Amino acid sequence: MGKSFANFMCKKDFHPASKSNIKKVWMAEQKISYDKKKQEELMQQYLKEQESYDNRLLMGDERVKNGLNFMYEAPPGVKKENKEKEETEGETEYKFEWQKGAPREKYAKDDMNIRDQPFGIQVRNVRCIKCHKWGHVNTDRECPLFGLSGINASSVPTDGSGPSMHPSELIAEMRNSGFALKRNVLGRNLTANDPSQDYVASDGEEDPEVEFLKSLTTKQKQKLLRKLDRLEKKKKKKKSDKKKKKLQKSKNKHKKHKKSSSSSSSSSSSSSSSSSSSSSSSSSSTSSSETDSSSESDNKEKKEKEKRKKRKKTKCSGNKSGDCKEYKSKNMLYEELSSSHSDRGKAQEKLRLLKQESSGENSTWVHSGSDRKSRSHQHSPERKGSDRNGGSRSRSRAEGSRRSRSRSPCGQKHREREARSRPHQSPSEEQKGRKGTRSHGDSEHRRERAR
């Protein structure tokens, strides 16, 4: 149980301390080193071949001159450039002066990014902006250009190897090294299109236009002046035309506004007059429509009354006197319904129902009459009594309906209308008419019995 967590994790495949991963890393390192050695050996062989080839050329061997080795030779300027690079690489640049003669280990010889920390020497990894030396800043007194501005520092004589103190060069170097001044110090960025960047004409130089005018003759100058005058006149005319058009547009707008205001006032007056005329016409039309409707209703009522009278006469002539009384009562009901109800649709429906009932009763009365004719001698006295009782019941119903009509205000109105519509008769004439109807009904009854 005393094993650590690392011992547990190194047994995993994904952990870098596992044996399989360590083996893979070692194999990759060995492969890289083998490739490097092989490339070095090939380079050494190539260099040996080149040396032998150069020696044969110096000896004046004709085979080498007539051979195809010139195809594999590098151009003549490449060797010199390679030599210069090797010389510069030999003289490495050091940040500090004490690094030139100081001994360094093998892993730190060629790498300048490694910071040395020698014993007893203060190392500041800082570079001065003015003198471009490492180990101090422009505000330190160690700097040889301390206390001098950029202009004065540029005037100070320096070695050819040292950097220049011109402000533009200093700004460029600052940018390269990662520093930058503020915009208010640099000022406005100048552009090529800026008017301050234009060339200023010297006194000796003349404008090309002036030279062209000097080269012209007097006639040509006169023609030019005429053309210029014409162009100026055309421009003036265009301006005056534009002004006139604007004035005309403004006037037209004012006129349209006035016309619209006048038309609106006239339309309001006409609308008021039309409204008054329409009101008068509507009143007249309503009055005329009312009169027409009243006249039509009167005509319809008269026609209905005439039809009912004809029906009464025909039905009374064919049936008995008791039947005639019942028909009269039903007709009275028809008249009351038509007069009492204002809605025509409802009155018509009720009239249809009553007509159907009356037609059914007529058919029953006709059948009963025929049965009486055939079986008049066979009837028992009890049947006759029952028939009489039925007739008395129908009479009592008719009398009750008449009384209810006389009591109701609608019935009184209907009677008044009938009295107006009928011609005025004396009481003696009315009695004669009643007797005539009774005698007519009795005579018909006697004829039926005789048959």
From Swiss-Prot:
Keyword Phosphoprotein: yes
Start and end residues of each stretch annotated as Interaction with RBPJ: 1-121
Modified residues (Phosphoserine): S202
GO CC terms: centrosome; cytoplasm; nuclear speck; nucleus; protein-containing complex
Region feature Interaction with RP9, mapped onto this chain: 204-232
Biased composition (Polar residues): 356-367
InterPro entries: CIR1, CIR_N_dom
Subcellular location: Nucleus speckle; Cytoplasm, Cytoskeleton, Microtubule organizing center, Centrosome
Keyword terms, alphabetized: Cytoplasm, Cytoskeleton, Isopeptide bond, mRNA processing, mRNA splicing, Nucleus, Phosphoprotein, Repressor, Transcription, Transcription regulation, Ubl conjugation
Iron found in the keyword field: no
PTM (free text): Phosphorylated by NEK6.
GO BP terms, alphabetized: in utero embryonic development; mRNA processing; negative regulation of DNA-templated transcription; negative regulation of transcription by RNA polymerase II; RNA splicing
Main location: nucleus
Pfam families tied to this protein: Cir_N
Recorded GO MF terms: histone deacetylase binding; protein kinase binding; protein-containing complex binding; transcription corepressor activity
Cross-link (Glycyl lysine isopeptide (Lys-Gly) (interchain with G-Cter in SUMO2)): K79, K355
Task performed by this protein: May modulate splice site selection during alternative splicing of pre-mRNAs. Regulates transcription and acts as a corepressor for RBPJ. Recruits RBPJ to the Sin3-histone deacetylase complex (HDAC). Required for RBPJ-mediated repression of transcription.
PANTHER family reported in the protein's UniProt record: CBF1 INTERACTING COREPRESSOR CIR, COREPRESSOR INTERACTING WITH RBPJ 1
The protein's name: Corepressor interacting with RBPJ 1
Organism: Rattus norvegicus
